[in-house]
């Protein structure tokens, strides 16, 4: 997992509340257990005017010109600004996979569904919670200023606006440690690889009949 330290990125405003995981990545694209291949179908039912299918050539599909991610001013955005209860619905881990592969490293919203929130940290995506009033102000500023960027410093737990105003956010210390060091569940386990091997060797000597 790629470490998350400091980043400055273009902000895309998704002005919708209660965005569920089926809207983030529709169910027909969930047949793969790989972590890749989901970015092109992020928000598929909103980005395109037709119904997408796995393996389809998206370059030939008709785009929805009104959807925010299809607007030229938001191309290359790495910060997604959202409304309350983002990521609700089913527990599919494909949702943060799709957001990450599309290019988003950060989501900012007033609240999240618990499972999506937890899955995001485990997959290198930082879900920042800010008060609703601060999120409202960010929406106003993003929509009024083309090329609007935010600077996020995970170590300092700050979001800095272009006007210099600094917004603080809370994050669990363990989750912060994992993101800063690029540690997913596998990475955490591998940190104890020597101890695991030592235990297995000792157990094999104590209970040899189990390994015959």
Swiss-Prot record:
This protein's pathway reads: Amino-acid biosynthesis; L-leucine biosynthesis; L-leucine from 3-methyl-2-oxobutanoate: step 2/4
Which organism does this record belong to?
Pseudomonas aeruginosa (strain UCBPP-PA14)
Q: Which gene encodes it?
A: leuD
An annotated GO cellular component: 3-isopropylmalate dehydratase complex
Q: What does this protein do?
A: Catalyzes the isomerization between 2-isopropylmalate and 3-isopropylmalate, via the formation of 2-isopropylmaleate.
A Pfam family (short name) is: Aconitase_C
Q: PANTHER family under this entry?
A: 3-ISOPROPYLMALATE DEHYDRATASE SMALL SUBUNIT, 3-ISOPROPYLMALATE DEHYDRATASE SMALL SUBUNIT 2-RELATED-RELATED
E.C. designation(s): 4.2.1.33
Recorded GO molecular functions are:
3-isopropylmalate dehydratase activity
Q: Which UniProt keywords apply?
A: Amino-acid biosynthesis, Branched-chain amino acid biosynthesis, Leucine biosynthesis, Lyase
Top-rank lineage group of the source organism: Bacteria
Q: What is this protein called?
A: 3-isopropylmalate dehydratase small subunit
UniProt key word Amino-acid biosynthesis: yes
The regions listed as transmembrane in this protein's record are none
Which top-level enzyme class is recorded in the Swiss-Prot or TrEMBL entry?
lyase
Q: Which GO terms describe its biological process?
A: L-leucine biosynthetic process
- Enumerate the catalysed reactions: (2R,3S)-3-isopropylmalate = (2S)-2-isopropylmalate
């Amino acid at each position: 997992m790629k470490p998350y330290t400091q980043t400055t990125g273009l902000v895309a405003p998704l002005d919708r509340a209660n965005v569920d995981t089926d809207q983030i990545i529709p169910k027909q694209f969930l047949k793969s257990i790989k972590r890749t291949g989901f970015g092109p179908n992020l928000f598929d039912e909103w980005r395109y005017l037709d119904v997408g299918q796995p393996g389809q050539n998206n370059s030939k599909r008709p785009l929805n010109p009104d959807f925010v991610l299809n607007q030229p001013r938001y191309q290359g955005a790495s910060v997604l600004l959202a409304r309350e209860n983002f990521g609700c619905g089913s527990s599919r881990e494909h949702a943060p996979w799709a957001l990450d592969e599309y290019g988003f490293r950060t989501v900012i919203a007033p609240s999240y569904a618990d499972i999506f929130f937890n899955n995001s940290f485990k997959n290198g995506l930082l879900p920042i919670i800010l008060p609703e009033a601060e999120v409202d102000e960010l929406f106003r500023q993003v929509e009024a200023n083309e090329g609007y960027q935010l600077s996020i410093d995970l170590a300092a737990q700050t979001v800095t606006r272009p006007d210099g105003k600094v917004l603080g956010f809370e994050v669990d210390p363990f989750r912060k440690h994992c993101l800063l060091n690029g540690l997913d569940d596998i990475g955490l386990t591998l940190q104890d690889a020597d101890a695991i091997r030592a235990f297995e060797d000792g157990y094999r000597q104590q209970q040899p009949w189990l390994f015959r």
